[in-house]
């Protein structure tokens, strides 16, 4: 019976290793093989007593059970999820256990390099991390390093910044020992691109200055607006704002002069026709005719005064004395004195016969200056009368005294 039991145990021992190897998944086998290759220098330097490396100690649940007993190997045929998770060396411990994991990795072999790893070891660590990611991402795990001590620097080198919060000194030491091609940290990116503004405070200040300059220029502080000369200068000089002069063309002036020779006053239909033909407004035509009539009346009055002076000079040379001739002419012009009723009636008759536009023209002359030597712009008069000459004045040469 004992021989048969021993035979069965030997048979089980002979058959179990292939079964245990077959039940092992492909990613797990790849991770364990890479972990043993990375921890090779530690084994070579430690001799016979250093056969168990840091990676094998980090995978202690699987390795200890594999060497414990044949009964435990039978149980390993159907590995449970906790054991499978523990068998993966790519698991990253919690932040509180980082020191313990690093210590275990350091105690794996006395000759195992950690902080001063060569580029070959860094490449092997990166390959182990990639293999662990292939097996661990399917289970929703975060990819980490292949060994306990070197997993943290490899992860920091691949991702540029630590996933878990640990000390800045450990991060700097981990980044300093890795290959430059694998480091994507923020300080190295800053050094690789010195042309870009690295200081956000300086960038904000320059942007603020540019924004302030644009706002000030649009508000008229840096680029002042042109002043309005049409109203400000005249209001300071004359006390009121006046419109700028209308510049008539030579063709418009010729046509207006022609219409003025035909008729001194324009009716509304005629004024509308002239304004439409000359591409002017009715107000411009009206004001031009009004100012032109005032100019014509002044010139006519000046001619009459010149004729009176010439007649006075002729009469003064052939008569008695200059003073007597003047008194005589005044008496002849004025006639004998009349009673109060007749004088008042004559005064009313003179007011009725006077030109109604004369007073209006005198008022409008100050408000609307001439545009050039020929004429000016203007406001219209609605009256259309054919009288070209003003009513006779009392002192004029053509006035005769009323019969008594």
UniProtKB/Swiss-Prot annotation:
Disruption phenotype: Perinatal lethality and dorsal lobe of the pancreas fails to develop. Reduction in the size of the islets of Langerhans, probably as a result of fewer beta-cells. Additional ectopic V2 interneurons (V2-INs) at all axial levels of the spinal cord; phenotype exacerbated in an LMO4 mutant background. Genes typically expressed in V2-INs expressed ectopically in motor neurons (MNs); phenotype exacerbated in an LMO4 mutant background. Abnormal guidance of motor axons in an LMO4 mutant background. It comes from Mus musculus. The lineage of its organism: Eukaryota, Metazoa, Chordata, Craniata, Vertebrata. Pfam families: Homeodomain (PF00046). SMART domains: HOX. Residues 355-367 have a biased composition (Acidic residues). GO terms for cellular component: chromatin; nucleus. InterPro entries: HD (IPR001356), HD_metazoa (IPR020479), Homeobox_CS (IPR017970), Homeodomain-like_sf (IPR009057), MNX1/Ceh-12 (IPR042768). The keyword Transferase does not apply. Transcription factor. Recognizes and binds to the regulatory elements of target genes, such as visual system homeobox CHX10, negatively modulating transcription. Plays a role in establishing motor neuron identity, in concert with LIM domain transcription cofactor LMO4. Involved in negatively modulating transcription of interneuron genes in motor neurons, acting, at least in part, by blocking interactions of ISL1-LHX3 complexes with regulatory elements. Involved in pancreas development and function; may play a role in pancreatic cell fate specification. Residues 36-80, 299-404 are annotated as: Disordered. The modification Phosphoserine is found at residues 78, 80. Residues 302-314, 343-354 have a biased composition (Basic and acidic residues). Keywords: Acetylation, Developmental protein, DNA-binding, Homeobox, Nucleus, Phosphoprotein, Transcription, Transcription regulation. Residues 241-300 bind DNA. It is found in: Nucleus. Residues 41-52 have a biased composition (Gly residues). PROSITE patterns: HOMEOBOX_1 (PS00027), HOMEOBOX_2 (PS50071). This is Motor neuron and pancreas homeobox protein 1. The keyword Phosphoprotein applies. Residues 53-64 have a biased composition (Low complexity).
């Amino acid at each position: 019976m004992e021989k048969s039991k021993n035979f069965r145990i030997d048979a089980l021992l002979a058959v179990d290793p292939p079964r245990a190897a077959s039940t092992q998944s492909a990613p797990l086998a790849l991770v364990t093989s890479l972990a043993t290759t990375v921890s090779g220098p530690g084994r070579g330097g430690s001799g016979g007593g250093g056969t168990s490396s840091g990676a094998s100690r980090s995978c202690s649940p699987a390795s200890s059970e594999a060497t414990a007993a044949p009964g435990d190997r039978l149980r390993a045929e159907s590995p449970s999820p906790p054991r499978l998770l523990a068998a993966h060396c790519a698991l990253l411990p919690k932040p509180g256990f980082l020191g313990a994991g690093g210590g275990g990795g350091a105690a794996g072999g006395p000759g195992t390099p950690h902080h001063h790893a060569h580029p070959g070891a860094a490449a092997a660590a990166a390959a182990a991390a990639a293999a662990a990611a292939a097996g661990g991402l399917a289970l929703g795990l975060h990819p980490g390093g292949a060994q306990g001590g070197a997993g943290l620097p490899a992860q920091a080198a691949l991702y540029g910044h630590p996933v878990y919060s640990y000390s800045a000194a450990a991060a700097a030491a981990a980044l300093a020992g890795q290959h430059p091609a694998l480091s994507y940290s923020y300080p190295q990116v800053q050094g690789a691109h010195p042309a870009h503004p690295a200081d956000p405070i300086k960038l904000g200040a320059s942007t603020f200055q540019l924004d302030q300059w644009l706002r000030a220029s649009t508000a008229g502080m840096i680029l002042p607006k042109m002043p309005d000369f049409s109203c400000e200068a005249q209001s300071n000089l004359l006390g009121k704002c006046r419109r700028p002069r209308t510049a008539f063309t030579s063709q418009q002036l010729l046509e207006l002069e022609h219409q003025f020779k035909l008729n001194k006053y324009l009716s509304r239909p005629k004024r509308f026709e002239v304004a439409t033909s000359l591409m002017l407004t009715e107000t411009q035509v009206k004001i031009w005719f009004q100012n032109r009539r005032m100019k014509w009346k002044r010139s006519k009055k000046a001619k009459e005064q010149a004729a009176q002076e010439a007649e006075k000079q002729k009469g003064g040379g052939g008569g008695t004395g200059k003073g007597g001739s003047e008194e005589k002419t005044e008496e002849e012009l004025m006639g004998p004195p009349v009673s109060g009723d007749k004088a008042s009636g004559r005064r009313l008759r003179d007011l009725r016969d006077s030109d109604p536009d004369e007073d209006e023209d005198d008022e409008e002359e100050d408000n609307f200056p001439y545009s050039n030597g020929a004429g000016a712009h203007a406001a219209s008069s609605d009256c259309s009368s054919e009288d070209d000459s003003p009513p006779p004045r009392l002192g004029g040469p053509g006035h005769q005294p009323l019969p008594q």
